[in-house]
Amino acid sequence: MTDTLSGTVDRITYFNQENGYTVLQLAPDQAMVPGLSKGGLATVVGSLPEVAPGEHLALEGRWTTHSKYGTQFAVEVCKPSVPVTPDGLKRYLGSGLIEGIGPQFAERIADHFGEDTLQVLEDQPERLTEIPGIGPKRSRGIQRAWEEQRGVKEIMLFLHEHGISTNLAVKIYKTYGEEALTMVRGNPYQLERDIYGVGFKTADRIARDLGLPTDHPSRIEAGIIYALEEDLGEGHTYSPPGSLLDRAVELLDCSPALIEEGLARLIKEDRIRVDRVPLPGDTPDGEVSPEQIDAVYLTPFYHAETGAASLLRELAGALPSRLSDIPPAFLEELHPPGEDAVALSDDQKAAAHTALTHPVSVLTGGPGTGKTTCLRYLISILEGSSKRIALASPTGRAAKHLSTATGQPASTVHRLLGYSPQEGFQHDREDPLEIDILIVDEASMLDLPLTYNLLKALAPGTHLLLVGDVDQLPSVGPGNVLGDVIASGAAPVTRLQSIFRQAAGSEIITNAHRINRGEMPVFPVRDPGAERQPDFYLFPAEDAAAAADWIVDLVTRRIPEQFGLDPREDIQVLAPMYRGPAGVDALNDRLQAALNPARKGFPEKALFGNTYRPGDKVMQLENDYTKEVFNGDIGTLREIEETGQILTVEFDGRLVKYEWSEADTLTLAYAVSVHKAQGAEFPAVVLPAVTQHYIMLRRNLLYTAVTRAQRLCVLAGNRRAVAIAVNNHQEAQRCSALDWRLKSS
C-alpha cells in the first residue's frame, strides 16, 4: 500500500546532481506524522527533481525505518509546486536554486512585488530591474534560470503523472535534457528505443494518456519493432511473416492492413529488411527445406547474418594462411616433449592437425573428453613456431577459466576487440587484430552480433578455432552460431567422444554423457565408510514445494556440513524457470532469508523488486562495458551507501559502484536460471527436477545444468521429471538462416 505525505521543504540535507538522490527535511501539512524531529520535521529520501527550501511537495511512497537514521519517508512519486506564501517565496527564491538570486535579493523581490511575484517572474521578468541592484543583464540571467528550473519541474511532474517512477524519470531527463517534455509528448515510443527500463507497454500507456490514436503510425511501427525484438529475445534472428503479423495484430489490437502499411514504412526507412530464406528446420533427410518464406529482420541483424556468412567463407578459403609455414615436424609430433607430456588420442591429434592446417575449424565434445588437453598441446606447437596467439571467451567467467586451464592469458571477446560504449569496437576490417590464430572457447555462447564483429576483426589468413560443447544450450542472444557453422559444413569439425580415465571416475561426467545420449543418469547411494564418495545425488521430492524445502536445507546445512563447501561462495542453485515454489524468484527469497536475513542495525534497500543487504550474492543482468561487468557475472554486495545512494559490488576482487537508479541491472543470485549459468562452473550445483517445470524439461537444459558442476551435483525432485527431460530432445527451433547462407556460397 502506498503512503502519502505533503508539506513544505525546510532544508536540503543532501542532493546528488547526477542521479537526483535527495535527503531533505519537510514540514508536513498533516498531523500525526511518524518519526518527526524535535523541530516537527519529517526526513524524506529518494530520487527527486532539484527542489528548494520553501517549495511545497506532494509525495507518494512508503514509510521505512533505517537502522541508523530512524523513520524516513522513501519517495516513489514527487509532485512539487512553487510556494505561494510570502515567507515561502523568500526562502524558495533565496535558496540558490535560481541563479542570480540570493537571500537578500529574494527578500527584496518578494517584498516589492508581494502576491504578484510569481506573475512577474513568469510574464514580466523585465520588471525585475525595478529592484535596486538588478540591472538588465542580471534580469535576463534570472529569467533564463527561472525558465530552466520551471522546465525541469514540468518534465518531472509530467512523467510522474503518467506513472513513471522518479528513478526512471531521472534517467529520461538525463538522456534528453530540456527537450525531454517535447520529445515524450511528440513520440513517447522513442523512449522504448533510448531508455533502458522503458518497454513498449510503458510507452504505449503514456501515448494513450496523451490521447494518441491507436492507429497512429508511430504506435504501429513501435509495436512491430517490439514484436521483432521479442523474437530476438527468444534467440531468433528473424521473424516468419505469418507469426509476426499475428502477434502484432494481437498486441496492437488493429487490422492486418495497418500492420502491412507499417511494415512498408519500416522497410522504406531501412529499419527492417525482408529476405527470402528456407523454411526453418531441416527436412527428414537433413537437407535444407526447399520451401521458402519472407523472413523479416531488424536491419542490423540482417547485416550481421549476411555479413557473418560472407566473412566466415572468406576466412575459411584464405590459403596459404599465417600458419602454413609451420614445419611438418611439429605437425607430426603434436605434443611437446617433457615429463608431463601425455600422448594425444587420435581424435585429439586430428583436431590439432585440423586447427593448424585449416583457417577455420571447430572442436566440440562433452566434459572429460580432453578439449583442454588438446588446446594445451596446440598452444605449445604454436608457441614453438613463434606464432601470435589470442585466446578469448564470450564471458569474463569463461575467459578466466580458459586462462587457468591453459596457463595462457585469455580475455572476453569484447575486451579483445577493444570495445567501448562510446566508440564501439576498435578492431574491425580497417584495424584487424595482429594475430595468427584466435581460439574462442565456450563458442556455443557466441550470439550472431558478437560473431559478426569478431569476424570483422580477423584479417584473411588468420586462423579461427571455435571450441565448445554444441550439445549445451545455445547462446542467450540471437542466433545459433556454433550449431549453424557445424551444420553448414563450412568448416571441418572434430568431435571428441572418448571419456579419459581421470574423468571416468566422476558420476557428474559419466551421467552428463548418459543424459546427452538419452539415457537415465545413475544415482549412487552414499556410503559413509567408503574411501571415495559419489559426486552426483538425487534427493526425492514429489512436487515443487518439497523440492524447494530440500534445496534450502541442502544449501544451508547438508552440503556445507558434509562437504565443507561455503553456501554462498561454492554452491550455486540453478533452476529451469523463474516462477513457482522451486523457481528462481522464490528460491532467491528463501535462500536470502536463510543465508543473509534482515538484522537490526544493518542496512538494507528495496530496489526494483529486490531487497538488498550487504553480503548478498548478486548477478549482473546486462553487459556494462563502462563498469566492465557482463551479463551473468556473479558478485557479492559489499556496501549500501545511503547518503550517496550507491551500491558497491565485488566481482572477482574488484569493487564496482552502482547508483540506485542503475540497480535494475542487478538481481539476487542465490539461484539463477540455467541459461544465465552458461560458461560458468561452480564447485557444487543444486537444481530442482520436478514435473511442474514440464515446459522446460529438455535434455540440453538438464545436460547444461549438470555440466556446470565441478565437484558435486545434487538434484531435488523425482525420477519421473528427470526421465521427461532426458527423453525430450525437442530443442526449441531458432529462426536463423546462417547455416543456409554458409551452405549456399
Each language-model region and where it sits:
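Conserved ATPase-coupling elements of RecA-like P-loop NTPase cores
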Residues: 443-454, 470-480, 697
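Accessory, non-ATPase domains that flank or precede helicase/AAA+ motor cores in DNA-metabolism machines
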Residues: 1-325, 335
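Conserved RecA-like ASCE ATPase "motif II neighborhood" in helicase/translocase motors
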Residues: 413-460, 672-675, 703
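Loop/turn-to-beta-strand initiation segments
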Residues: 388, 434-438, 461-465, 712-713
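The Walker A (P-loop) glycine that initiates the GxxxxGKT/S ATP-binding motif of P-loop NTPases
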Residues: 97, 130, 365, 393, ...
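Conserved helicase motor core of P-loop NTPases
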Residues: 470-627
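ASCE P-loop NTPase motor cores of helicases and related translocases
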Residues: 280-438, 492-501, 508-543, 600
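C-terminal accessory regions
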Residues: 517, 633-745
